[in-house]
Amino acid sequence: MRKIIPINNNWYFKADYEEGYEKVDDLRSFENVNLPHTNIELPYNYFDEKMYQIKSCYKYPLHISEKYRDKVIYIHFEGVMAYAQVYLNGLYIGEHKGGYTPFDIRIDEVYDWKKELNMLTVVVDSTERSDIPPKGGQIDYLTYGGIYREVSLGIYDDVFIKNIKVETHGIYDNEKSLNLIVHLENLNHQSGNVKFKVKINDKNGKEVFYKEFNTYLDAVKDVYSFNIENLKDIKLWDVDNPNLYEIKVGMKINNFSDEYDNKFGFREAVFKPDGFYLNGRKLKLRGLNRHQSYPYVGYAMPRRVQEKDAEILKNELHLNIVRTSHYPQSKHFLNKCDELGLLVFEEIPGWQYIGNSEWKKVAEQNLREMITRDWNHPSIILWGVRINESQDDDAFYKNMNKIAHEIDPTRQTGGVRYITNSSFLEDVYTFNDFIHDGINKPLRKQQEVTGLEHNVPYLVTEYNGHMYPTKRFDNEERQMEHCLRHLRIQNASYLDDSISGAIGWCAFDYNTHKDFGSGDRICYHGVMDMFRLPKFASYVYKSQVSPDIEPILEPVTFWARGERSIGGVIPLIIFTNCDYIELQYGNKTKIDNIYPNRDAYKGIPYPPIIIDYDIVKPEMIGAWGMVWEDLTLKGFYKGNKVIERKFSREPIPTYLYVVPDDTILSATQKDATRIVVKILDQYGNLLPFINEVIKIEIEGPAKLQGPNEVALIGGA
């Protein structure tokens, strides 16, 4: 049998842990909380990061039905930051180092069946311990604290399926195959004849395979492998058509049984010296890095919000890859990447610092836990086995690569560095290239970076970021240059076949330590802010999609004559995927058939339109002394107008835009959604310099995250 019971509601929390709390049963001084939970709610900015670097205590009064007395019972933690010590009825039963990977603690052997309630206690150390990655040195992000992911109770028979791994083969054949590897937990060393039932369904629930396998269960063997062949009419998983299959593995031996299910996809992902190939098709990778942090609550966001980030990256920014900087991220985020067709480069926790031998052991364990949790995700195409931007440590990294390849021989490894001529021990040379300062070349040639005389599989994993921090409320000129830097680098990536792609720094602004950022504990490095609201630079990525899917027409302007130095709006950069546009300035100037600037940007699929004085004269578009007029832009695709934008010469607050991402939330578990508030002008455009205070009131069984009075930031 298998029964998984979520235990996320009605925990009890105390922020000021004192020795002996693990034996306390009186919960009157504890706060009632639900998981995911942050150990302290932080301000949006200007706070002391030591606020969350505390030792806290969580308690859960646990009742397990008497009918499970003879079963094997585990508590499963998805993520606790950063060092967890677990107790049951005051008795220590286990611990875990590392805040980004899951762990299990067995409790059936110590559970007191005579008690109505057993007290589960988790002491959480969220201080920056130097023995746990990524801690030990300076870190350009915050790690927050608490039991910030979900917890569940797992109830099993003496023999149960601990994990399965699906390795697909022959993806170009008419009849495909796979190797199913089943990992068992055989706690009492049972032996005898065992039957495995394997069923595979497509995304519509249609059965595509069923077979029973009979074998012998060896008391000391815990891994069993089965070849499944002659799979017909199988559809490949791809970024455009992410076909997923569900596999269900049933097991029965003596009086014990179990069933384990997971999802997977048939696909081949390979980095080569001349680029990246997905299912034999060369694909230029275009992506951004993602931190899993949010305003106020840090990492502690539930499933819906984690999934929303994947939707933003894939469906709003039209990326085809994301890097999980700099740690394994929520299973809900990764599951959504599988569903949407968003490729993932997942890496271990770390940031520049390499610790002592004990620290390295934790890093090795983090790597094992990451891969065994996530090895069936078709979206994951690369394991990051190196501490981000660390110096070379050949012995350590040879071992990390060995571990990754032993656990998962089906994927390549990468190791992100910023140093050139680094020891190349992985399968893919992954490099943070910050060469571009707005003037010089956008990207280095790979041999200039690697120091090798031949090309190798090569991926740019960061660019821009700290080179040009930009706020959503910055002036138009700075935001325009921010756009151009992202544009130049993406264009250069597309023009160089030896570069598999480029992953920019980064998708969203994020909180950071005092040693970094703009002094207010925020790094404004994103193409969106912390609330996932777009900056102009997001249009570089947003526009890289077929107009058949979504026509895009986004000018980089507030449409104000005096916003830029000296004045005017020329050059006017317009990010679009239209064939051409038409410009109308008031009733005075009309220019037809303005085409994208393919001469300047030959690489990127959809280059921007740049309107300069070769296209329009100053007097045609409101020179000084002339009357400022409205702007109308019309985008055309295949000869038809598909999109139109208007900008007012005299914008005034006209609309209060209040739109939630979701209108229905779960009442049975912790849930959350974002509500976007904007002040718009008469044409529906954001008013970027309005900073009015808004007051938020909630009716019904919901709680606001953050303050109930906030000032608009850049109009939203």
Swiss-Prot record:
The keyword Nucleotidyltransferase does not apply. GO terms for biological process: carbohydrate metabolic process. Keywords: Glycosidase, Hydrolase. Belongs to the glycosyl hydrolase 2 family. PROSITE patterns: GLYCOSYL_HYDROL_F2_1, GLYCOSYL_HYDROL_F2_2. It holds the Pfam family Glyco_hydro_2_N. The gene is lacZ. This is Beta-galactosidase. One of its GO terms (molecular function) is beta-galactosidase activity. Thermostable up to 70 degrees Celsius. Gene3D superfamilies: Galactose-binding domain-like (2.60.120.260), Glycosidases (3.20.20.80), Immunoglobulins (2.60.40.10). Displays beta-galactosidase activity with the artificial chromogenic substrate o-nitrophenyl-beta-D-galactopyranoside (ONPG). It comes from Thermoanaerobacterium thermosulfurigenes (Clostridium thermosulfurogenes). Homodimer. Optimum pH is 7. The active site is at E389 (proton donor), E462 (nucleophile). Its EC number is 3.2.1.23. It catalyses: Hydrolysis of terminal non-reducing beta-D-galactose residues in beta-D-galactosides. It comes from the Bacteria.
